[in-house]
Every structure is written in structure tokens, then in C-alpha cells.
Amino acid sequence: MQYYVGLDVSVKETSVCIIDKAGKVIREVKVATTPVAILAVLTEEALAIERIGLEAGPLSQWLYSALAEAGLPVILLRPGI
């Protein structure tokens, strides 16, 4: 099954929401805004993650780079869409 991840990034915490192809919420959790903490959530189960989206902004560039370097299918989304 395919899974999709949304990240709502703030200075101290990031909300992580994982849904399946049907849109059913599989997991919601808040973690520290660090690549290590976010990667831990995304890799603790062997999920076939199709896409990870986070809003483009001042807090997203370094996080996007870290997730992409880890081989995850991450994209930046334009604010307001």
C-alpha cells in the first residue's frame, strides 16, 4: 500500500501526518523539528512512502535537503495551495 506524509513545520515542533492511499489517517504525531526526529518517525515502520510534502518557507529548506539526502520522496509545496 502507498502512504503519503504531510509535515507542518514550526520552529520547535513538526506535526507529522501519515495517510494511506484512501486518505485514512494512519498516524499523527508531533516531534522536534530536526531531521533525526522526523526520520525516526518516517522509518520506524516499513511503509511504502509515495510522497512527503511540506510547505516552502524559511524553515523548510534545510529540512527538505536533509530528507532528500536520506533518499525520501520529498517535495516543497507553495504556500496557500
Go through the PLM ranges and name each one:
Residues M1-I81:
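Phosphate- and other anionic-substrate recognition elements at nucleic-acid/protein interfaces
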